[in-house]
Amino acid sequence: MNDLMIDLETMGNKPNAPIVAIGAVFFNPMTGELGPQFYTAVNLASELAAGAVPDGDTINWWLKQSSEARAAITSDEAKPIAEALDALTNFVTRSCEQPKYLKVWGNGAAFDNVILREAYERCSKAPCWNWFNDLDVRTMVNLGRRVGFDPKRDLPFDGERHNALADAVHQAQYVSLIHQRVIPMPDEGSENEPG
């Protein structure tokens, strides 16, 4: 699989926002198959030390979320950002069929992907994907609504909202469902049938 859905939990909404959790799942948008999954909480202090800038409104928003969602981002097992990025890169290297062609999906590409790339830069590390392979969940949602599928209405959420891995899995599922409606897979054997 060469499609990776990422979801970040952050303490801001700008490119320099501190990341507090990274969730990722490989998936095949043509079939909906889910592949290897990745999750880590990120130590907020390490992000601030690296130069990330929190946003008060986002912090206030987090304070209003469920205790489960808050607990996931304040885990004692949270890794320093540099270790979390190394773990993500190692996960991609182990799990991706062709890392050179890895496509990274974010909700949207101007949020998760940009913030994650900025974190790699703050830590003087090379991102694990090429910038030209950023893909946008929001564009797919717009297409889905145009063909009669609204993921917020038509696909129930399974898991804890605002958990980076649960969000990534949900996004991969609805991107796949939309992809299959927009570009249906041919029926097996249809290529061999007389036209």
Task: Say what each PLM segment does.
Residues 2-4, 9-106:
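Conserved non-catalytic scaffold segment of RNase H-like nuclease domains
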Residues 40-42, 128-141:
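A short, structured active-site edge motif that brings together acidic residues
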Residues 47-49, 54, 58-63, 134-170:
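Active-site-proximal helix-loop-helix substrate-binding element of RNase H-like nuclease domains
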Residues 82, 86, 113-114, 138, ...:
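Non-catalytic, well-ordered alpha-helical scaffold segments
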Residues 92, 96, 111-132:
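Substrate-recognition/cap helix-loop segment adjacent to the acidic, metal-dependent catalytic center
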Residues 103-110, 114-115, 149-195:
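Acidic, Mg2+-coordinating catalytic module of metal-dependent nucleases/exonucleases
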